[in-house]
Design a protein with these regions (language model features):
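Conserved structural elements of the adenylate-forming
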Residues: 59-64, 170, 202-223, 228-235
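Conserved pre-ATP/AMP-binding loop-to-beta segment of ANL
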Residues: 15-18, 170-191, 198, 221-227
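Conserved AMP-binding/adenylate-forming core of the ANL superfamily
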Residues: 8, 16-87, 91-95, 112-117, ...
């Protein structure tokens, strides 16, 4: 069972229940100022301190992104890199990639410009989705990164060398794309920490992504009544 089916199931069964919550340290809240030091939430300067989406909206956003990808030529087996801090858009983008049958490639947000280029070329990514904090690092090698790749920017004031995520998905269908995905299809590439050299790419099938989610749930014993605090970076 591909992990995307869990999202679609929850959207059907619990459409109006909250699925994701983002707390933005750029909007101070005296009850949560200790979060600021972690710098793990994508800046959203024109949004309130707290943003949230329901399961149905989560799934719709993933579908819109998936349909946008397909419309731009992304197909099963292609690779889409994600270079963003933790934010409300991160998981809908990740699941949107999976829904196309493409392979999600999360990048460590600590990568410098050369490491980004190295990993993009090593994984042979077809698209890089990045946030505001990474404009400078992407721009450093924008000419090489944009050769044969699409650069998609998530945020306000889109740089000239990229295309705007929000504009691209605005008119896309919220229905799931008609793509068959099996447990044996490849779903993600995660990179090693690179402590002994440049990071190494590790390819995962959908089956391993599903099993990881199941093991996490069993380990923590969580249920739909619980709220799971995600402090670690989502690329990990």
């Amino acid at each position: 069972m591909p992990v995307t089916e869990y999202l679609e199931r929850n959207a059907r069964l619990y459409p109006d229940e909250v699925a994701l919550v983002e707390l933005n340290p750029d909007e101070p809240d005296t009850r949560r100022t200790s979060w600021k030091e972690f710098e793990l939430i994508q800046p959203s300067r024109f949004e309130p301190y707290r943003r949230e989406i329901t399961w149905s909206v989560f799934d719709e956003k993933a579908n819109r992104f998936a349909n946008m990808l397909i419309g731009r030529g992304i197909k099963k087996g292609d690779k889409v890199a994600i270079l963003m801090y933790n934010c409300l858009e991160w998981l809908p983008i990740y699941f949107g990639v999976l829904k196309t049958g493409a392979i999600a490639v999360p990048f460590n947000f600590r990568y410098d410009a050369e490491e980004i280029l190295y990993c993009a070329e090593l994984a042979e990514v077809d698209m890089i989705v990045f946030g505001p904090a990474f404009i400078g690092r992407i721009e450093t090698n924008a000419e090489r990164l944009s050769k044969g790749r699409l650069l998609i920017y998530v945020g306000d004031n889109c740089p000239e060398f990229a295309e705007s995520y929000h504009q691209l998905v605005a008119d896309c269908s919220s229905h799931a794309p008609n793509v068959e995905i099996t447990d044996d299809d490849f779903g993600a590439i995660y990179f090693s920490s690179g402590t002994t050299g440049f990071p190494k790419a590790i390819l995962h099938k959908h089956q391993s992504l599903t099993q990881a989610a199941q093991m996490e749930q069993k380990h923590h014993g969580t249920s739909r009544d619980d709220t799971f605090l995600c402090i670690p970076p989502l690329y990990h």
